[in-house]
Every structure is written in C-alpha cells, then in structure tokens.
From Swiss-Prot:
Pfam families per record: Ectoine_synth
Function: Catalyzes the circularization of gamma-N-acetyl-alpha,gamma-diaminobutyric acid (ADABA) to ectoine (1,4,5,6-tetrahydro-2-methyl-4-pyrimidine carboxylic acid), which is an excellent osmoprotectant.
A single GO molecular function term of this UniProt record: ectoine synthase activity
Name the record gives this protein: L-ectoine synthase
Top-rank EC class of the record's enzyme: lyase
Catalytic activity: (2S)-4-acetamido-2-aminobutanoate = L-ectoine + H2O
InterPro entries given in the database record: Ectoine_synth, RmlC-like_jellyroll, RmlC_Cupin_sf
Species assigned in the record: Hyphomonas neptunium (strain ATCC 15444)
BP terms from Gene Ontology: ectoine biosynthetic process
Disulfide bonding pattern of the chain: none
Gene behind the chain: ectC
CDD domains, alphabetized: cupin_EctC
Protein EC: 4.2.1.108
Pathway given in the UniProt record: Amine and polyamine biosynthesis; ectoine biosynthesis; L-ectoine from L-aspartate 4-semialdehyde: step 3/3
Length: 135
C-alpha cells in the first residue's frame, strides 16, 4: 500500500515548479502503478501551450476556473470545479487559468512520468525511452 500526504510531499523533491504552474507528483513510474498521479496548480492568469505527444492525460478540476482550447478544432471548454477533461488523442491544447485565482487540478498520466521530465519547446514531455537514453 502506498500512502502519501500532499501537505508533506509539497515540501519534497516531488514538487516541481515551472512557469505558470507547480505540481506535486504523488505517484510516479517507480511506484509501479502503471500511471502517475499529480496535484497540479495552474497559476492565476497563466496561459499554457501544451502537447503531450507521448502521454495520455486526464484532469479533474478541484478549485478555480479557466478554460481549455483544443487547437485542432478551435473549440474552447470552460473549466470549473467538478469538470474533467481527457487528452485521449494527445491533443495539442492551451490551458488558461482565470486571473482571479489559481486552478487546482488532479492529473493522471499514462504512461506514468518518472518525475524527471520537463516540458520541451513543443509543450511535451519526452517519451520514457528517450528520457532513459538521455540519462
């Protein structure tokens, strides 16, 4: 059984900070679950251009409001607490948090991330094999 406390893990190297967001990676590849699980905060007013070419992601909004735009269709969806979206086609997208407050999101990645990934210029994490080959 794996038990982790967000309030404690936020103070460890499981917390990753970047421009416009921070994330606490509660489950990673080494945990052997077949997916990774993160609590991610999108900073108020952030606009993030992302494209997870090598991962599928599902996201559930717990706090805050914003929107996600599917760059293939141009369709924009409002995000608020209780809304889930899934990037089931490695969808290129723009995620926006409204200016008033951050959004707190619960995120699941498949395949799981290792915890060492950083977003590339294209907004993607590298494939696990590419990450291992660069180590």
């Amino acid at each position: 059984m794996i038990v982790r406390d967000l309030a404690k893990e936020i103070l460890t190297d499981r917390r990753v900070d970047s421009d416009g967001w921070s994330s606490v990676r509660l489950l990673l590849k080494d945990d052997g679950m077949g997916f990774s699980f993160h609590i991610t905060t999108i900073h108020a007013g952030a606009e993030l251009h992302m494209h997870y070419k090598n991962h599928l992601e599902s996201v559930f909004c717990m706090e805050g409001t914003g929107s996600i735009t599917d760059l293939a269709t141009g369709e924009t969806h409002e995000i608020r607490p209780g809304v889930m979206y899934a990037l089931n086609k490695n969808d290129k997208h723009i995620l926006r948090a409204n200016a008033g407050a951050p959004m707190m999101m619960a995120c699941v990645f498949n395949p799981p991330v290792t915890g060492k990934e950083v977003h590339g210029e294209d907004g993607a994490y590298p494939a696990d094999a590419a990450l291992e080959n660069s180590a």
